């Protein structure tokens, strides 16, 4: 059964697709929400809290509903990403953005405004201040959020099942297909490997937490 896993091209491709999507979605989510959280927490722009509400809106919808909405939208507006990994990346980023907001907003609230003001008085522009002052201070929250989004992206199924196409399967889709086809021996083998991989990610998260001072992940 385990030899079947390593010799089956669809399974190998699904592993790479899952890793690529998880890495990209975690990175985009954490960087994008760090900017949104700065606007919400550190500025006095009118309606800034509306951004927080919009970013948290995907929590209201199940993944299946969100996937269906994205599918209908991109079928009506043919942009050329339907049936590719790009549309799955759009859904992943949208669905997991609320988690990035929670991690980043908690960290952003702990950064004193005086640090930004001191940088600005020294002649630093906004981008330099954000890159050299805020991002290093946000590192524990960014790291914790990145690992969490990476893990939940790896196991995402409900939205992916509506948006994948042949050749763009992810691991969760392959597990579902093995179940549907009655290949329970191969399913069990892949499930064991999948659980061990997730366990390794959790252990890595705990190590990184101790290494960089993240208390909870």
What are these regions (language model features)?
Residues 1-10, 154, 160-206:
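Interhelical loop and adjacent transmembrane-helix boundary motif
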Residues 31-35, 68, 94-116, 154, ...:
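Membrane-embedded alpha-helices of multi-pass transport/permease systems
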Residues 57, 61, 94, 101-104, ...:
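Transmembrane alpha-helices
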Residues 54-61, 87-97, 147-154, 164-166, ...:
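Hydrophobic transmembrane alpha-helices
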Residues 9-40, 47:
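Transmembrane alpha-helix signature in integral membrane proteins
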Residues 43, 47-51, 64-97, 127, ...:
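Membrane-interfacial helix termini and adjacent extracytoplasmic/periplasmic loops
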Residues 39-40, 47, 105-116, 120, ...:
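C-terminal transmembrane helix and the adjacent membrane-cytosol boundary/short C-terminal tail
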């Amino acid at each position: 059964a385990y030899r079947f896993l390593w010799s089956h091209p669809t399974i190998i491709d699904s592993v790479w697709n899952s890793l690529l999507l998880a890495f990209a979605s975690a990175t985009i989510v954490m960087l994008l929400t760090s900017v949104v959280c700065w606007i919400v927490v550190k500025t006095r722009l009118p309606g800034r809290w509306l951004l927080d509400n919009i970013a948290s809106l995907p929590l209201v919808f199940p993944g299946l509903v969100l996937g269906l909405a994205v599918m209908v939208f991109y079928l009506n507006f043919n942009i050329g990403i339907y049936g590719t990994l790009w549309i799955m990346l759009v859904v992943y980023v949208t669905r997991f953005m609320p988690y990035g907001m929670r991690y980043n907003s908690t960290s952003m609230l702990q950064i004193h405004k005086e640090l930004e003001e001191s940088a600005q008085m020294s002649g630093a522009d906004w981008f330099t201040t954000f890159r050299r002052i805020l991002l290093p201070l946000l590192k524990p929250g960014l790291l914790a959020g990145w690992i969490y989004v990476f893990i939940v992206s790896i196991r995402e199924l409900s939205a992916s099942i509506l948006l994948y196409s042949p050749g763009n399967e992810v691991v969760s889709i392959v597990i579902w297909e093995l179940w549907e086809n009655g290949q329970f021996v191969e399913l069990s083998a892949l499930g064991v490997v999948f659980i061990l991989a997730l366990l390794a990610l959790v252990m890595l998260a705990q190590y990184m937490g101790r290494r960089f001072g993240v208390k909870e992940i």
